[in-house]
Amino acid sequence: LQRHQAGGERAASTHHGNTKKLLDAIVAAYEVDLIDAVKVPEKDLNRYDRIGFASGIYYSKFHQAVLNFAAVNMPQNKQTFFISTYGGKADYTSIEKALTAKNSVLLGKYGCKGYDTFGPFKLMGGLAKGHPDEADIAGAVAFYKEITEEK
């Protein structure tokens, strides 16, 4: 979440903490407010200029708590961005649908591989071991810098 010239995101990292690793790196570099959508299902976001939604991808969807949070709390006409980690592939359809009626302006999306042992992947030892790695994490910070710099 970005308060005027500050920064921010949203996370509900529940599997291996992959998405939280990206957000922790952004928090270390920028002034942001993190809100855990699992623990805080309702929050007034009107004071924020930019609102980011971050999640692991679960069966091609953002975490249900993040989707619910977005649908309930996202104000009209705000700038938004998405950050995700995934074992298979990035898919932003669910969060985009949750924000359809909010007239938000999408600033960008960042996604990277994340270690995944969800469901059948556990039997194979998981997907994307070692991710997010340092390059993935640096990419998330660079993405945040790019979308928040004044043009």
Predicted regions span which residues?
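Cationic, amphipathic, low-complexity alpha-helical segments enriched
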Residues: L1-R3
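Conserved acidic segment of CheY-like receiver
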Residues: E9
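Short acidic active-site motifs
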Residues: K39-K43
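FMN-binding flavodoxin-like domain, especially the glycine-rich phosphate-binding loop
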Residues: Q5, T14, N18-K21, A25-I35, ...
